[in-house]
Structure formats: C-alpha cells, structure tokens
Curated annotation (Swiss-Prot):
Residues given in the record as Fe cation binding sites: H27, H74, D157, H161
Keyword match Metal-binding: yes
Keywords of the record: Iron, Metal-binding, Oxidoreductase
Cofactor binding mode and count: Binds 1 Fe cation per subunit.
Enzyme class, broadest EC rank: oxidoreductase
Subunit architecture: Homodimer.
One Gene Ontology term of the molecular function aspect: metal ion binding
Gene: sodB
Family matches, as PROSITE patterns: SOD_MN (PS00088)
Required cofactor names: Fe cation
Transmembrane segments: none
Stated name of the protein: Superoxide dismutase [Fe]
EC number: 1.15.1.1
Amino acid sequence: MTFTLPQLPYALDALAPHVSKETLEYHYGKHHNTYVTNLNKLIPGTEFESMTLEEIIMKAKGGIFNNAAQVWNHTFYWHSMSPNGGGEPKGRLAEAINKSFGSFAAFKEQFSQTAATTFGSGWAWLVQDQSGALKIINTSNAGTPMTEGLNALLTCDVWEHAYYIDYRNRRPDYIEAFWSLVNWDFASSNLK
C-alpha cells in the first residue's frame, strides 16, 4: 500500500495569525510529507506493505513505527485545529470534561501544563480510556495513544517544528494560541 500526504482541512494561511502560513509550509509540506515519503520507502518487501496505517502502528517497531505514527499523529493534529475553532466544547464532550476535570478551566489549565512541560519532542493528548473517562496524557517523540488502548480526542503537537518559526522558544505562548484554534467539533466526533 502506498500512502499519500492527506490534504489539510483548510488553506495553508487559514490558521494565521496563531499559526503562520510559513509554519504550515514547513510543518505540513516538509515534515509531515517526509514522514509519508519515509514510510513508503521503508515498507516495500515487509509484512507491513499491505497493512493500513493503524495496523502498521500497532505492529511495527523502530523506523517504520516512528514514521507511520507521525503520519497518523500529524493528520490527527491538523484536524484538531480549525480557523473557526476556539471557545469551549458543547454537549457530551463538555459534560465529559466537567465530569473528569471538574470544569473546562481546570481541564484547560491541566492540558496546557502537560503540553508545556513535555520534555523534548512530543504530543499532549485528550484521550478517553476504556471506561469512558477522559484523561490528559503526553507521549514522547512518535508515541500515540492508540498503542496504549486509548481513544484520542484531541492533540497538540509540542515538537519544536510545530511552533519555532512563530514562537521561537516560547512554547507556552504557542499553547495559548492553540486554544484559539481548537476544533471542538472534531474532538466531539471522536468521543465514544
């Protein structure tokens, strides 16, 4: 199976001023695309060549896992944001956040703290566990909740390439800007 770079759900300049067109040109057009290209170079002639992306992630190790997971993580991240995003969730997701964290404000503070304090490169995630409870986790490098049996609802990429053009070393400023873009409809659609 040959993988292709998924289309962004918005134009390259649609997230500005929070995330610039230049950042998306590099992050999506170069970084994400490189993971797709590398995965396509690594899987021919292996047991993974006819598997779906999710099957590869669940079974692979090393370079194949890293590139497959980064393709999936980035695609999920692009959908976690919207030019019409921000605000607060509604309906079932709002209720689940209040039940798990006490309030939206408490959730936002905990998620921001997790994202800001993730050491090195990684991801901050809002996930749903097997019991239906919501949790905030971080994964390092190419880690993904899928391999931990968790259902991803929302993610914030905290690899430096996600924010360095716009925010330099000010990760907390990038995280604050992320809240203006959060696609709550997408997060809600992932709720089981």
